[in-house]
Amino acid sequence: MIKMRVRFPTLVLLLGIVFLMAVSIGIAYGEKNVIKNHERPQEREQEERDPRQQPRPHHQEEQEREHRREEERDREPSRGRSESEESREEEREQRREPRREREQEQQPQHGRREEEEEWQPRRQRPQSRREEREQEQGSSSSSRRQSGYERREEREQEQEQGSRSDSRRQRNPYYFSSERFQTLYRNRNGQIRVLERFDQRTDRLENLQNYRIVEFQSKPNTLILPKHSDADYILVVLNGSATITIVNPDKRQSYNLENGDALRLPAGTTSYILNPDDNQNLRVVKLAIPINNPGNFYDFYPSSSKDQQSYFSGFSRNTLEATFNTRYEEIQRILLGNEDEQEDDEQRHGQEQSHQDEGVIVRVSKEQVQELRKYAQSSSRKGKPSKSGPFNLRSNKPIYSNKFGNFYEITPNRNPQAQDLDISLTFIEINEGALLLPHYNSKAIFVVLVDEGEGNYELVGIRDQQRQQDEQEVRRYSARLSEGDIFVIPAGHPISINASSNLRLLGFGINADENQRNFLAGSEDNVIRQLDTEVKGLTFPGSTEDVERLIKNQQQSYFANAQPQQQQQREREGRRGRRGHISSILSTLY
């Protein structure tokens, strides 16, 4: 009994101790869960704020765990934890450790996943605030890119519309505006310009790579200094009058040239051109055929100026002294020029400007003009061109003529000067409101310059000649024409020219020997009209009678009224309007 009494208090004491331990364990475990539950939202919020944050070092996590253990020991009412509790805590930490490692392994891959999702459709999953912001930024950037594409498309459309309004000049390889000329020399007395190469913009004009167009203009009482060139020239005066002097080793010849006069100037021939008029400017156009290098030619001047050097300056001192049997200083002073001596001469002559300061186009006095024109010959106004002298493009009757225009032509077989060059010259006059009927040249390529007036032309070609024959597409090349413009008519390409004002055209025909001009409409020289009647019915969709009636409907040849049907329609509408006005007045009276 006594033993039972002793054991009972002991049992109660043990139960009390166990109860206290359980209570302490429960309190500690509850506090730990509260701390852990309080820390996890912060960790998730930190991960959402910066998902690419690098994992914390392992020793830092160990320090934090040890610090938490010490805090938990301080909170316990008992003397400390039992070994079983510590072991359970370590087991819980070990269970949490693999989860952290998995999270750490997933964090470096998050950036790659976002990069992949930029190029792939996003998955249907909940998004954080940061992801939503990124998606909004991505959508805004894509919208900006899309708006940029739209702006670029709008600019391209505007450029395309601008090119259309500009007569498709940029897409027309056969048209060259006057702005395509490049200035070689320019001063206050005039200028010399050259057109860009024909084959520079398209390989369709490859056969014209050895032909260039040169134009020079000079004011009254001026002289273009002597020079020679490594190119053959065919020269035509378009405005004013000129006196040209051609110098050969054994003689010198001078010719007076008027508007429409032409002259062959062989390569290597020294020449100089004078504008003798007191009031009118001189304008000359030349077709250049280079000798040494296709498409390139050079002018060689014996004198030096601010625009070019004398070809004598290219020789050595010893060569010049031996050539002229004179000291070099004297040669330099007389031929090449000395800057110091030029300044002294200017001071002695009252600062008067020297010819070397003016350039290649200089002013001359009236006395010098009279002396230069003393022995000049005039051009031939009648008959065939001579072998050496100038000739006029309108010296003979036009080959095509009616009340709407005139067509002059000098073929190689009628022009001894251009026969070896295989060049023909044409001069076309189209009256205002008239049309040069559609036609094509059998083998000649024509380079046409607008001398005066305005109009437009339509040239028919093939869009892509590299395709097969059954895939070729007809294309119309058109442009507005004004003074100074140039266009090319390839062989076999039909063309028509419409004059909105009195139009004057100068043409150089290349490969012109035995060329034949074939008109596609009109009462004469019409190749369509020469087709057999049965062939006409088989060629066109209309009946044979309709085709015959349509072809014969045009009574004019070569030139015609540009808008006959429109004018008749306007006249009929005007008469109909007047009758309607009178009938309305009568109806009000009665």
From Swiss-Prot:
Start and end residues of each Cupin type-1 domain: 174-332, 391-548
SMART domains: Cupin_1 (SM00835)
Family matches, as Pfam families: Cupin_1 (PF00190)
Signal peptide positions (record): 1-30
UniProt-annotated glycosylation sites, renumbered to this chain: N239, N498
Segments of skewed composition (Low complexity): 137-146
Biased composition (Basic and acidic residues): 38-105, 346-362
Keyword Transmembrane: no
The keyword Lipid metabolism appears for this protein: no
Highest taxon above the source species: Eukaryota
UniProt keywords, alphabetically: Allergen, Glycoprotein, Seed storage protein, Signal, Storage protein
Further facts: The variability of the residues taking part of IgE-binding epitopes might be responsible of the difference in cross-reactivity among legumes.
Function per UniProt: Seed storage protein. Accumulates during seed development and is hydrolyzed after germination to provide a carbon and nitrogen source for the developing seedling.
Similarity comment: family membership: Belongs to the 7S seed storage protein family.
PANTHER family hit by this protein: OS03G0336100 PROTEIN-RELATED, VICILIN C72
Entry protein name: Conglutin beta 4
Native source species: Lupinus angustifolius (Narrow-leaved blue lupine)
